[in-house]
């Protein structure tokens, strides 16, 4: 299945407990816009299945991407692979508002896959979990060098520092 056609027909599994409707597709990343992601190196790749478990439809699978990013703390560019585990409920009637809705026994796969991927993105993209960032004073990348800036003194201790300077 290509990203131009991302409807998955579930008619054959709706009334059959234990039935599965597998899928495998690629999604264009042209419409995804994240400030820290410079580019996606390839389309999002998704695979999995919608499973009927005792009349409850659940989409299970993964969606994965390779991205080229900019660190939100230090500005360094880095590559990151991200895989999101999918576990989304599918509504069989319109009364289930907090689930993804079917229309004419079909689900809109790109809506579910993009939504799951976007909601799982990190709020801040970091080159490494312990990134020290840049010095506010001189701009030195604290991951690689120490800065020579004088640390600001807490104003509550300023009087004591004046005594130490004498």
Write out the residue ranges for each language-model feature.
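Structured interface patches
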Residues: 1-166
């Amino acid at each position: 299945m290509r990203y131009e056609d991302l409807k998955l027909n579930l008619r054959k599994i709706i009334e059959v407990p234990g039935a599965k409707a597998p899928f495998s597709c690629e999604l264009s990343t042209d419409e995804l816009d994240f400030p820290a992601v410079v580019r996606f190196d390839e389309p999002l790749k998704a695979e999995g299945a919608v499973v009927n478990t005792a009349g409850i439809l659940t989409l299970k699978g993964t969606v994965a991407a390779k991205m080229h990013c900019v660190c939100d703390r230090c500005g360094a560019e880095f590559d990151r692979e991200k895989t999101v585990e999918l576990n989304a409920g599918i509504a069989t009637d319109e009364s289930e508002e907090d689930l993804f809705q079917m229309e004419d026994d079909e689900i809109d796969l790109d809506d579910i896959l993009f939504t799951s991927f976007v909601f799982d993105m990190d709020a801040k993209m970091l080159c490494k979990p312990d990134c020290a960032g840049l010095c506010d004073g001189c701009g030195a990348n604290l991951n690689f060098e120490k800065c020579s800036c004088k640390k600001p003194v807490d104003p509550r201790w300023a009087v004591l520092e004046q005594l130490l300077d004498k």
